[in-house]
């Protein structure tokens, strides 16, 4: 199981204050907020208020990252919550026959939901950037195969792959 705080594998890739970095920080914060909503059952409005008031400053292993873009953080979070049923269906359609979203770690579910939301409903960044950033977030939280799984699933969603083909390239039963 992943910790709520990522390790040093994910860090700022340019100078603080950059809009791109603020959005990358907002993506990480949205993942953390969804995790908290899932685990602690914190209501959406409370989590938005908490994060915007107290948690937009991101620090990992003592390294300060750019402040998260509050509006973008809220857009991702609200978008995932409002579209959770079709997002979850889209994720389930990409998983192998023996795997379902409910079986995944809460952190991985949050990463996939945020990534699928941006790829499908609201991301204005290029597909490759979104897949890369959410894959980096997965690698920051997990040492195992979860990063590769996130990459494969988000890449499939980003390319608009047929939903009847799972991550292992086999057709799902009709």
Feature-to-residue mapping (PLM):
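N-terminal interaction/assembly modules
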Residues: 1-174
């Amino acid at each position: 199981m992943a910790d709520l705080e990522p390790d040093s594998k994910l860090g700022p890739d340019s100078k603080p204050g950059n809009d791109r970095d603020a959005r990358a920080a907002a993506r990480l914060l949205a993942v953390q907020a969804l995790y908290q909503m899932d685990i602690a059952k914190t209501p959406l409005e409370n989590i938005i208020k908490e994060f915007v008031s107290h948690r937009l400053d991101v620090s990992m292993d003592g390294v300060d990252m750019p402040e998260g873009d509050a509006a973008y953080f809220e857009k991702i979070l609200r978008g995932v919550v409002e579209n959770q049923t079709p997002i979850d269906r889209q994720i389930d359609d990409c998983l192998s026959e023996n795997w379902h979203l409910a079986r995944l770690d809460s952190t991985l579910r949050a990463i996939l939901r945020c990534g699928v939301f941006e790829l499908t409903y609201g991301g204005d960044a290029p597909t490759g950037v979104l897949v890369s950033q959410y894959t980096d977030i997965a690698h920051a939280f997990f040492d195992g195969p979860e990063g590769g799984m996130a990459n494969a699933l988000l890449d499939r969603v980003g390319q608009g792959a047929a939903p009847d083909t799972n991550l292992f390239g086999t057709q799902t039963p009709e």
